[in-house]
């Protein structure tokens, strides 16, 4: 599979292939909020000076946000960088259990260290968007969790996750999408980190704020673990522009909470609307989701539909073949503004009238 199908958000490369501008494409392949916040005015010093290697102000802002000590936080060049260091610890700890279907970056990170892993098959049929019990995992030394799960949108209850900390030598929990879920913080494992040495929680500001190009994420774990990661990594993994933007976004707790409420209300409203619209298409089943993307299933390949939307309507949906356990009969749709969601539904209706699935 070529690289543009392993991850969403490849507007530039797809635009080149289609002979259009990136701005001509409606990208529903990446699950980002459809707006961006007001960003700080860049000063010459931000560009000229070396960034703070300890990320002190950003760590303090994150610590205040989560109510934990600064020592439990480490900023990173997106969540992907932090998965790489978590995978190094995982490879040293033994066999990893990866959720399937799941985000391919976990296995990519383990591959950097020749870390062994097996799949933990999740159910491909579920109901509702409320917190659910995490399916009982097999035996291994390391458990990787994504909450809410990508790509299914299932939200796991903290009550079902907490006992797993006693079963595994290391638990790595990806909570990149959790801030977009109404009351999602109630299911977060971050409050458990201070008293739990074998837990790593990784988050990203990319999805919540729509700043994928800046690459800004953070890990919450015991200080000894994070100090090791800091010694292994490059000297300046987070650039000054990303740090300044992060401090602007998180510097005011009240402003951050307003943003979260706005984003959560949008995800709930547009998710319900899209569910209703997609459910009437014969041959397509939209799966329940707690977050800002919907997984859709059909009894036959959806690749022709995806390609038609791309070629004829300049709409990008997520090819799910990169998710282990899914195939051509699955697509993922990142929620957009109501106007753009209508555009997606209208284009799908037109293409499905030409080539029905049922």
Can you annotate each of these PLM segments?
Residues 122-183, 295:
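Active-site phosphate-binding strand-loop segment of PLP-dependent enzymes
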Residues 56, 70-94, 217:
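Conserved beta-loop-alpha segment that forms the PLP phosphate-binding cup at the N-terminus of a helix
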Residues 159, 311-312, 322-358:
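PLP-dependent enzyme catalytic core of the Aspartate aminotransferase-like
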Residues 267-268, 278-313, 335:
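Conserved PLP-binding catalytic core of the aspartate aminotransferase-like
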Residues 89-111, 116-123:
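Conserved PLP-anchoring active-site segment centered on the Schiff-base-forming lysine
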Residues 1-54, 61-64, 139:
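N-terminal "arm"/small-domain region of PLP-dependent enzymes with the aminotransferase-like
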Residues 37-38, 301-307, 339-343:
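Short, conserved charged micro-motifs
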Residues 198-280, 284-287:
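PLP-dependent aminotransferase class I/II
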């Amino acid at each position: 599979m070529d690289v543009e199908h392993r991850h969403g958000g490849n507007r530039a490369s797809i635009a080149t292939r289609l002979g259009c501008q990136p701005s001509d494409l409606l990208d529903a392949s990446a699950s980002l909020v459809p707006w961006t916040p007001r960003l700080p005015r860049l000063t010459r010093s931000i560009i000229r000076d070396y960034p703070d290697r300890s990320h002190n102000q950003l760590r303090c802002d994150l610590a205040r946000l989560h109510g934990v000590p600064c020592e439990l936080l480490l900023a990173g060049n997106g969540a992907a960088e932090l998965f790489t260091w978590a995978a190094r610890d995982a490879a040293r700890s033994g066999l990893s259990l990866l959720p399937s279907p799941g985000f391919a970056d976990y296995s990519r990170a383990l591959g950097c260290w020749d870390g062994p892993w097996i799949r933990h098959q999740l159910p491909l049929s579920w109901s509702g968007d409320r917190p659910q019990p995490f399916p009982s995992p097999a035996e291994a030394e390391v458990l990787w969790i994504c909450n809410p799960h990508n790509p299914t949108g299932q939200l796991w209850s903290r009550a079902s996750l907490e006992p797993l900390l006693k079963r595994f030598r290391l638990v790595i929990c990806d909570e990149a999408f959790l801030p977009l879920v109404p009351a999602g913080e109630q299911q977060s494992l971050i409050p458990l980190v201070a008293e739990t040495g074998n837990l790593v929680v990784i988050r990203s500001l990319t999805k919540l704020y729509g700043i994928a190009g800046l690459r800004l994420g953070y890990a919450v774990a015991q200080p000894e673990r994070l100090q090791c990661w800091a010694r292994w990594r490059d000297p300046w993994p987070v650039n000054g522009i990303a740090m300044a933007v992060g401090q602007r976004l998180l510097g005011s707790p009240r402003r951050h909470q307003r943003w979260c409420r706005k984003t959560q209300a949008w995800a709930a409203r547009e998710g319900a609307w899209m569910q209703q619209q997609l459910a009437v298409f014969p041959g397509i089943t939209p799966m329940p989701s707690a977050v800002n993307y919907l997984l859709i299933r059909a009894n036959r390949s959806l690749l022709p539909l995806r390609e038609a939307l791309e070629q004829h309507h300049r709409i990008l949906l997520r090819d799910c073949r990169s998710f282990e356990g899914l195939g051509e009969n699955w697509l993922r749709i990142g929620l957009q503004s109501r106007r753009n969601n209508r555009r997606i539904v209208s284009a799908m209706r037109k293409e499905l009238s030409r080539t029905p699935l049922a």
